[in-house]
């Protein structure tokens, strides 16, 4: 029964969370790995969105939303005291089928489960163990990390096998001396081949019941014990789920044998003592080779298949997985190694080793063979060809060139508006390329458009305008960030009426040439948002020693209709010292203390302010009017719609304004001729 038929969500993996207790979780970023270099705090672009390599949790836990697949409840191990009861009520995740269940909810009599001792709440559930399903690679699964010396660290700690049956009889004792030259096959039987099972006296067993028919026991897995097969040729041997490699396991069992006898497999020689293995017919051999080839072809394209499917195929194929295996080698139980290195031999399915000539055939399951990798194709970066330079002359239909050069045509195009330029771009390809010149597009107006399409954004970038009006548009943060990163020469930007969600893109886009910024009537702007906009960027690139704010070079700032307080004005005076025009109209929190901050002796705007708009600020009174005499360069002061300001006080200020008198074309509007 497959995992897909066990209920909805049976095979869905739960993303584990940090334990927040291990050494990797409590440390800080290293700042040197490629993930740290990508982070914005270390000067990177921030595209990978990954944490530091040294901060990867070594014991991730299940999320708090994980529940049992059978009863639908969370883990309740904290409500009991005994170890067995805690284990029965805790949630366990299977590494094969990814099911999360309580061990007590599984109603299985004769079954075993292998607990992973490194990762919490992780095991191989009894259902998968009973069906004979294993992981794709038993040596590289979760919790089986290799140590620095090349050995598997999980083998030192070991796992536990849980069962309800009595333990089997003890295994054969380890031999101390050299093996006899000619033992009978009943002493240490080799692995039963598929053809031998079909042609022998024993009835064939189902493929998935090979591992499920083992005798279960409760045994600590670990140490250097090498378990061979029992005396009963029908029962497969019990092996620990993790071994170091074939050479180490064999040397620990038989220390008296020289390495040259067991490192390289040799073909067995038929002896008179042992019975001969019956050879299959040529038709059956062709059928077996065809089945193996079909299995290999099915595995090559399906690299992302589930572990249960690949393991069942590996178990059913036995020891005959090689496509180019000779018939004689298949009958004698020998399979050529896939590679010369010990790692490839360790990752193989079953490995047959003959210690000496005429010796017994020893075999142990080292895990199923992984599916072969698909052929890797060469990858090349395909870049578009460079654009050819623009022609200096206009080719005519007759084959000659127009007498006017490109510079003369551009001077003619400068007298045309945007609509006429778009018409000229449709005349010919040469005019279309000439009309993209940025001198023809000093200002582009896209205001009051509900949405901006990608062709519109691409057209703006190709024209490189100096002033861009995006007021009252539905531009998104991603679109605005894409635009600003490609308009480094932008001097004027109008974003009035947009949402702060999109305007917040200004915090991550460099605008070195910006001189005018219009942020009037932006929704949901508080002191915290304005502080984020005014403060220097936290991701200063390496080599930049000065911490300049984003608005250091801005000369005109329009903040009408925002909820600004005196704290925001202090930040404004500190991080925007070059302002000559400031619009604070209709700001409800601006009053007499705000005017005192703007005109204080320590204020940098006292000497640079030329235009000041305070229209609609209802908290201003007549007491703040004498403070404006501190600004010697003030040429325009707009106090219209200020309810608490009297016209007589404004007239007295206009008559005695420094260094000369103001004129009042309208009530509460003070102008001075330069």
UniProtKB/Swiss-Prot annotation:
UniProt name for this protein: F-box/LRR-repeat protein 19
Description of post-translational modifications: Acetylated by CREBBP; leading to ubiquitination and subsequent proteasomal degradation.
Biased composition (Basic and acidic residues): 133-149
Domain comment, as recorded: The CXXC zinc finger mediates binding to DNA containing unmethylated cytidine-phosphate-guanosine (CpG) dinucleotides.
LRR repeat locations: 472-497, 498-521, 561-586, 587-616, 617-641, 642-674
Binding-site residues, Zn(2+) 2: 30, 33, 36, 52
Stretches annotated zinc finger (CXXC-type): 12-58
Binding site for Zn(2+): 68, 71, 94, 97, 102, 105, 125, 128
């Amino acid at each position: 029964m497959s995992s897909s038929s066990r209920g909805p969500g049976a095979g869905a993996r739960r993303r584990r969370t940090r334990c927040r207790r291990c050494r990797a979780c409590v440390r800080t970023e290293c700042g040197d790995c490629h993930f740290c270099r990508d982070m914005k705090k270390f000067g990177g672009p921030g595209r990978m969105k990954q944490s530091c390599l040294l901060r990867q949790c070594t014991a991730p836990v299940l999320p708090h939303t994980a529940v049992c697949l059978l009863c639908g409840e969370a883990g309740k191990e904290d409500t009991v005291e005994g170890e067995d009861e805690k284990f029965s009520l805790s949630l366990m995740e299977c590494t094969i089928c990814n099911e999360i269940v309580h061990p007590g909810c599984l109603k299985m009599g004769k079954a075993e489960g292998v607990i992973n001792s490194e990762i919490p709440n992780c095991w191989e559930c009894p259902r998968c163990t009973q069906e004979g399903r294993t992981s794709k690679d038993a040596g590289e699964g979760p919790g089986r990390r290799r140590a620095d010396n090349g050995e598997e660290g999980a083998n030192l700690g070991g796992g536990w096998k849980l069962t309800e049956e009595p333990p089997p009889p003890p295994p054969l004792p380890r031999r101390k001396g050299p093996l006899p030259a000619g033992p009978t096959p009943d002493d240490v039987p080799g692995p039963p081949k598929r053809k031998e099972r079909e042609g022998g006296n024993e009835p064939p067993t189902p493929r998935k019941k090979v591992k499920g028919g083992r005798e279960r026991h409760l045994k600590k897995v670990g140490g250097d014990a090498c378990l061979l097969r029992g005396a009963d040729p029908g029962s497969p041997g019990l092996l620990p789920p993790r071994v170091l490699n074939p050479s180490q396991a064999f040397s620990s069992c038989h220390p008296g044998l020289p390495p040259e006898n067991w490192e390289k497999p040799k073909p067995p020689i038929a002896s008179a003592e042992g019975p001969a293995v019956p050879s299959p017919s040529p038709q059956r051999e062709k059928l077996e080779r065809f089945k193996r080839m079909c299995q290999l072809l099915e595995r090559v394209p399906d690299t992302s298949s589930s572990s249960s499917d690949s393991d069942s195929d590996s178990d059913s194929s036995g020891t005959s997985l090689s496509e180019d295996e000779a018939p004689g080698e298949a009958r004698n139980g020998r399979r050529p190694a896939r590679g010369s290195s010990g790692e490839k031999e360790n990752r193989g399915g079953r490995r047959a080793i003959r210690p000496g000539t005429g010796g017994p055939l020893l075999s142990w399951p080292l895990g199923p063979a992984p599916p072969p990798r698909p052929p890797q194709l060469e990858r090349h970066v395909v870049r578009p060809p460079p654009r050819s330079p623009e022609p200096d002359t206009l080719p005519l239909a007759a084959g000659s060139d127009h007498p006017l050069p490109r510079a003369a045509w551009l001077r003619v195009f400068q007298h045309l508006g945007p609509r006429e330029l778009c018409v000229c771009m449709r005349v010919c390809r040469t005019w279309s390329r000439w009309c993209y010149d940025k001198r023809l597009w000093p200002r582009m107006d896209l205001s009051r458009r509900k949405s901006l399409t990608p062709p519109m954004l691409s057209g703006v970038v190709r024209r490189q305008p100096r002033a861009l009006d995006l007021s009252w548009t539905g531009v998104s943060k991603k679109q605005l960030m894409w635009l600003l990163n490609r308009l480094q020469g932008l001097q004027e930007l109008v974003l009035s009426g947009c949402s702060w969600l999109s305007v917040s893109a200004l915090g991550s886009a460099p605008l070195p040439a910006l001189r005018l910024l219009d942020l009037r009537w932006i929704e949901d702007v508080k002191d915290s948002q304005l502080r984020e906009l005014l403060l220097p960027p936290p991701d200063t690139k390496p080599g930049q020693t000065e911490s300049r704010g984003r608005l250091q070079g801005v000369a005109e700032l329009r903040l009408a209709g925002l909820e600004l307080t005196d704290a925001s004005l202090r930040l404004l005076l500190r991080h925007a010292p070059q302002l000559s025009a400031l619009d604070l109209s209709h700001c409800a929190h601006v009053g007499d203390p705000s005017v005192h901050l703007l005109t204080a002796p320590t204020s940098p705007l006292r000497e640079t302010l030329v235009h000041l708009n305070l229209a609609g600020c209802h908290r201003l009174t007549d007491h703040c009017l004498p403070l404006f005499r501190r600004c010697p360069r003030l040429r325009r002061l707009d106090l219209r719609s200020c309810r608490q300001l009297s016209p007589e006080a404004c007239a007295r200020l206009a008559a005695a304004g420094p260094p000369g008198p103001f004129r009042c074309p309208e009530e509460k509007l003070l102008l001075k001729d330069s």
